């Protein structure tokens, strides 16, 4: 659901940054060349990829099949979190399956999408969440955990995140930046 809804929302929201009224503008020899150069210069590869996916799922041919189904899944996820928060105030879990990735990791777009898996549910549910550094792994890269709370209970999430960060004493910077 996330990989349908997020690109659809990105496509819709970023459509106004056309270089004519908003955002970066790169002049071309005609209007079409201006659009092409502006979009090429103004958005990175991942943003462009998500905009293309989003435009496709919002098309009349795909809207009911993909977007509306994803919206139903989003509602189910939100309902599940609401049920969970009847039993507790906050949920703490890892931010990802491992450490942060080195900047030069060379991961494919699909591998980068997989890194989001631990964070997509709360984004879909519309609940506050905060990722907090909680130490460095033996490879020198940071580890993180995230705190999630009820909808509009942002302050409680931030208070626990601040406490975790102070207790974890993560005052070290990562020893590995570029995979070295």
Task: Explain the meaning of each model-derived region.
Residues 19-20, 57-59, 96-99:
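Short glycine-rich anion-binding loops that position phosphate/pyrophosphate groups of nucleotides
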Residues 27-37, 71-79, 111-113:
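Short gly/ser/thr-rich secondary-structure transition/capping motifs
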Residues 48-79, 87, 124-180:
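Structural helix-boundary/capping segments
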